[in-house]
Each structure stands twice: as structure tokens, then as C-alpha cells.
Amino acid sequence: MMNKDQALIFELSKPGRVGHSLPELDVLEQPVETLIPAEFLREEAPELPEVSELQLMRHYTALSKRNHGVDSGFYPLGSCTMKYNPKINEDVARYPGFANIHPYQPEAQVQGALRLMYELQTALAEITGMDEVTLQPAAGAQGEWTGLMLIRAYHEANGDTNRTKVIVPDSAHGTNPASATVAGFESVTVRTDEDGLVDLDHLREVVGEDTAALMLTNPNTLGLFEAHIVEMAAIIHEAGGKLYYDGANSNAILGIARPGDMGFDVVHLNLHKTFTGPHGGGGPGSGPVGVKKELIPYLPKPVVVKDGDSYRLDYDRPHSIGRVKPYYGNFGINVRAYTYIRTMGPEGLRTVSEYAVLNANYMMRRLAPYFDLPYDQHCKHEFVLSGRQQKKLGVRTLDIAKRLLDFGYHPPTIYFPLNVEECLMIEPTETESKETLDEFIEAMIQIAKEAEETPEVVQEAPHHTVIGRLDETTAARKPILRYEKITQ
């Protein structure tokens, strides 16, 4: 018997079943052939599901129960900052003065929105130690690309057209080399040393007259603070390059350290991560970019400026790289981030990072006896473990991740960064209680013991989810992305 919770909505369909009633036609009925040219008409009716309203509700309610989000459970996805998104953000984003305006309205009619954008630009500049910020980029990767295009424009304006290479660490997010390529640069890899930090000697080897920039996350993707950042900045600047800050891990340093004070020239932030815009499920995101003074002329236009007591969009930017997104950024996400910043205040933001770092270190130390700890030092907001010892028992990191589903948890990031064997990257964020952390830790300890005593339990997981382990290789190579009715 078919499990109705697993059935496609097409499989619930019965001919003639109606899910909605339409009002009586109040215009003259005409054959569709007289209204639409024949070449645009289907020869057969589309195979749309015919279900009742109740069936429809039950079907999608059942599907929603199979989803996992921050509001439903712990989500320790490393390098993603899956923190709780305060619901006051949603209330403010729904204010009619924000939700019902149009980007083509006269500036005089949207002064509240322009003020919010201006004050958000100012706040982000202060938080990061930059001189000016654009809110246009739609997400982190576009922020990276925008920042690199600003660096390209700066070098070209100075006649420095031979700077074709961008340096990225071997532990970097994949978007870093991808953004460099899309921006027209060649990416060059710098190694990580035995302490999990950028190898300074190797950095000196790869830096040269063709270096446009070094892209860096600090703390890095291993969750470790690049303690030699000032020296690294000097190496890049002496070579004539720029230092780019990937803000993916900003949740570790709010109110404690600023990229601009470390020597960074360009910064992007992920407002949908650090500043509680909801994310997961495809967006939207927001990836503002901040720059130091010498790069301001190249920022995307327009930028919101303040004239006396009013605000306007400044298009008079002759050296701008132009727009990077239609209109003025993902405004709704920016409203949420602004609300979060105003709610927390400077001290609150600092506390966010202190708790994020505390939670990560607590989890790391409690789990270290059961999993390999590649870098045995204090971490920042996230940390990496290795499943090397479990691999020797026939249990892979993928198996551990699948087994966690049985406990109701979203797994951590796995097999990234690539320079850690059988990697698990865990980021608890500041919003989780000690009780939640302890429950997750106990689940991980149980899985470690199962790997030793009953490895098949882990190897065959998950056992309690609606759908068991999938053939992910076949799904990736031979995807079936649409429903097709098979007739005998």
C-alpha cells in the first residue's frame, strides 16, 4: 500500500476531483481558438493534478514536516551561521512604508527607506572599519565579485594592468576562486601551515608584481584566527596588492575586531548570516561591500547620501563600476539586518560574538576525546573535527552525518574544508542554549561509540526518517527533475 505521505501530488490525482470553486462567468464566453493563435495552443490538456482542497493542504503540510530549519531544530552547519532570526525583523519588514513602496517612486516619497539604507551603510562601515559601503550586491558571492571588480577598477585607473592574479588560501570557500575567475583573474593557492593558518613563507613566494589581491576569511574556514594578519597585510600592500575580507565568518568578531583595522581594503558581509536575514532554501540574501577611501570612487551607483535633513540617491559617480543589481539591493533583507543592529546595539553585537566563540569552544573540547581534532587550539565561532579514527572502523563522515538525522539534527558541514581528511565543520552560533549543545554532543558521542561497537548501525543510517539513504551518485548523474506519466 502506498504511503500517502511519500506520494507525489500527481499520484493522488483523480479525474474530475475539484479543489476550488470559481465564480460564474460574467463576460461573454469565447472559444480559446479565437483568442490565441493555433501555434501557441496545446494539442492535449496538461497533466495537472486533480485533488481536493483538503488533499492539497494535507499533502503540503506533510511535506513541510519533512523540512528542517532553525525554528524546528539545531542546525550546526559550519560556515553558514544558522542562527535564530528574531521575529521582530519580520514585523518591521512588513511595515507598509517598507513593504508597499516601489523603487521608481520619487525620492521625496520614500525618505524613510532611504534613511534606513543610509543608516545601515553607516553602521556597517563602523562595524567593519571601512569608509563607505554599498548595499547593492544580492548575496555573498556577488559581494565577492563586486569587491574584486572594485579592485580591478582601482588597479586599471592607476595604469597597473598587469595585476592578473588573486591569491586564495587552500582552505578558502569555493566561491573565492570562482569569484576571482568570473572577475577575470587567475586564482593562486597559498598553503595552510601546521597550525591551520596561512603559511607566511609560502605567501611571500606567491606574491609578486602580478598580484591584484589576497582574499581571506578571518577567522579562517578552520575556525582559527589569522594571528599574523597585520604582517600578511604588509606583505600584500608592499607588493602593491589589495587585501580582501570575505565576511563569511564575521559572527566571531563583532564589536571585538574590525577588518579595516587589520589592514583590509575591501570587505563583504553576509547580512543573511551574521545579521539575521533568513537564509536557507535559496534566498534572498544580501552581500554589502565596504571599502577604504581610495576605492570609494569605484563603488556601484547609486549610493544613498544625506543632504541636510533629507536623503537621495547619488548617481554622480563617473568612475563607478556601474550597477551590479537592478534597483538598490535586496531591500527587505536590509530592513531585517538594520532592525537586528538597532535591537542589539554595540554591546549586544559584541556579546553575540563572545557567546558564539564560547559555544564553539565548549563543544570542541567536549567532542575532542571522541573525534580527531586536527588543530588543538582555541577556535573562534566554529571548529573542525576529523572522522579519521572512525574511518578506520569502516564508518565514514558521511555515515556520521546520516546517523545524526535519526536524532533530529541537521548534520554539520562535511568534507569541507578540503584540507582536512573526513572533515566535520561545526558552527553552533550564539543563539543555542547549553542544554541544546549538550544534547547534540551526547548524540555525537553515541555515534562515536556505535562506530566502535555496532558500525552497521551508522553505516546504514538513517533509520527513522521518512526516506532512507538515497543513491546520491545516481541522483546526481541521472536526475529526474519533472513528473512524467508513464502509459502502458
UniProtKB/Swiss-Prot annotation:
Residue(s) carrying N6-(pyridoxal phosphate)lysine: K273
Record keyword Glycoprotein present: no
InterPro entries xrefs: GcvPB (IPR023012), GDC-P_C (IPR049316), GDC-P_N (IPR049315), GDC_P (IPR020581), PyrdxlP-dep_Trfase (IPR015424), PyrdxlP-dep_Trfase_major (IPR015421), PyrdxlP-dep_Trfase_small (IPR015422)
Entry GO CC: cytosol; glycine cleavage complex
Catalytic reaction(s) noted: N(6)-[(R)-lipoyl]-L-lysyl-[glycine-cleavage complex H protein] + glycine + H(+) = N(6)-[(R)-S(8)-aminomethyldihydrolipoyl]-L-lysyl-[glycine-cleavage complex H protein] + CO2
Cofactor(s) the protein needs: pyridoxal 5'-phosphate
Keywords noted in UniProt: Oxidoreductase, Pyridoxal phosphate
Enzyme class per UniProt: oxidoreductase
Known EC number: 1.4.4.2
UniProt KW Oxidoreductase keyword: yes
GO molecular function, one term: glycine binding
Signal sequence annotation: none
GO biological process, one term: glycine decarboxylation via glycine cleavage system
UniProt cross-references to Gene3D superfamilies, sorted A to Z: 6.20.440.10, Aspartate Aminotransferase, domain 1, Type I PLP-dependent aspartate aminotransferase-like (Major domain)
Subunit note: The glycine cleavage system is composed of four proteins: P, T, L and H. In this organism, the P 'protein' is a heterodimer of two subunits.
Family recorded in the similarity comment: Belongs to the GcvP family. C-terminal subunit subfamily.
Role noted for this protein: The glycine cleavage system catalyzes the degradation of glycine. The P protein binds the alpha-amino group of glycine through its pyridoxal phosphate cofactor; CO(2) is released and the remaining methylamine moiety is then transferred to the lipoamide cofactor of the H protein.
Record-linked HAMAP family: GcvPB (MF_00713)
Listed name of the protein: Probable glycine dehydrogenase (decarboxylating) subunit 2
Organism lineage string: Bacteria, Bacillati, Bacillota, Bacilli, Bacillales
